[in-house]
Design a protein with these regions (language model features):
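Central helical "cap/lid" subdomain
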Residues: 153-154, 160-211
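Loop-centered beta-sheet repeat module
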Residues: 130-131, 135-136, 142-154, 173, ...
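A conserved short coil-to-beta-strand element within the FAD-binding core of flavoproteins
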Residues: 94-104, 122, 143-160
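Conserved FAD-binding catalytic core of PHBH/FMO-like flavoproteins
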Residues: 119, 211-212
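A short coil-to-beta-strand element that immediately follows conserved catalytic motifs
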Residues: 60-62, 145-146, 195-198
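Rossmann-like flavin
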Residues: 11-135
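N-terminal glycine-rich dinucleotide-binding loop that anchors FAD/FMN and/or NAD(P) in oxidoreductases
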Residues: 1-4
Length: 212
C-alpha cells in the first residue's frame, strides 16, 4: 500500500520505524505470523458465531476474497506470501485471462490474474454492525459507562481494577482498545509495545450500481 508521511513527523517516527524494520526478517515474520494466526485464522466463523440469532447478523455476508494481479507472472512474483498463506490453510483458486472478467465484471480488462479464497465474508455496514452488537451487549446485561480511564491498578503485575475519574471498578480482566493512547494505560502492566498512529479510512457506497 502507498505510504504518505508528513516529513516533519519523521524524527518522532524513526524509533518505531527502526523496530519495524528489525522485525522485517523471515525468522521474525514467521514468529509474528505464528502468534497472529490463532487470532485471525477463523475470524469469519467467529463473527458468525458471535452474531447468530441477533440483530447484528443481517450485516454479515458470505463472500470470496480475491487478490488481483495484472499478470500471472506478477502472481508468481508473490510466491513467498502465498507460501506462507497456504501453510495456514489459505490456498487460492487461480482465475486467468478472460475468465477474470467473467468472474468479476467490474474489473478492468487489463487484469489477467485473480487469486480467489473461498469461505470468506464481509460486513455491509460497519457502523450498523457495531451499533447492533452494542445493543445486544446491553440487552444481555452489559453495562456502558462513559468516563475517562485514569489508570489500570495492579498487584503483582495483574490487573485488579480500572480507575475512572471518580470511581474504581474491580475486575479480573480488562481489554485496552484505545490504540496509540494505550501507552500510558499499560505502563503499570510492564508491557512495552511499540505503538504509532496510522490514519485509517473506510468508504461505504450507498446503492452502488455494481458490486463484487
Amino acid at each position: 500500500s502507498p505510504i504518505f508521511l508528513r516529513w516533519h513527523y519523521f524524527p518522532k517516527l524513526l524509533p518505531w520505524l527502526i523496530k519495524f524494520m528489525a522485525n522485517a526478517t523471515e525468522s521474525r515474520s514467521k514468529k509474528i505470523i505464528e502468534n497472529l494466526a490463532p487470532l485471525v485464522q477463523d475470524s469469519v466463523d467467529q463473527h458468525k458465531s458471535l452474531v447468530k440469532g441477533t440483530s447484528a447478523e443481517k450485516w454479515l455476508r458470505d463472500s470470496k476474497f480475491s487478490y488481483i494481479y495484472k499478470t500471472h507472472e506478477a502472481f508468481k512474483a508473490d510466491a513467498y506470501g502465498w507460501k506462507v498463506k497456504s501453510e495456514y490453510g489459505f490456498i487460492p483458486n487461480l482465475v486467468l485471462g478472460n475468465d477474470v472478467r467473467d468472474e468479476e465484471p467490474i474489473l478492468s480488462p487489463d487484469v489477467r490474474c485473480m487469486a480467489v479464497l473461498e469461505g470468506q465474508g464481509y460486513i455491509t455496514n460497519p457502523l450498523g454492525y457495531v451499533t447492533a452488537l452494542f445493543d445486544v451487549f446491553q440487552k444481555n446485561g452489559g453495562k456502558f459507562i462513559k468516563k475517562s480511564v485514569k489508570n489500570l491498578n495492579t498487584v503483582n503485575d495483574h490487573i485488579y481494577s480500572v480507575q475512572l475519574e471518580d470511581e474504581e471498578i474491580i475486575c479480573q480482566k480488562a481489554v485496552v482498545t484505545s490504540g496509540i493512547w494505550s501507552k500510558n494505560l499499560i505502563k503499570n502492566l510492564k508491557i512495552k509495545v511499540p505503538l504509532e498512529t496510522e490514519r485509517g479510512y473506510h468508504i461505504v457506497y450507498e446503492n452502488p450500481s455494481m458490486e463484487p
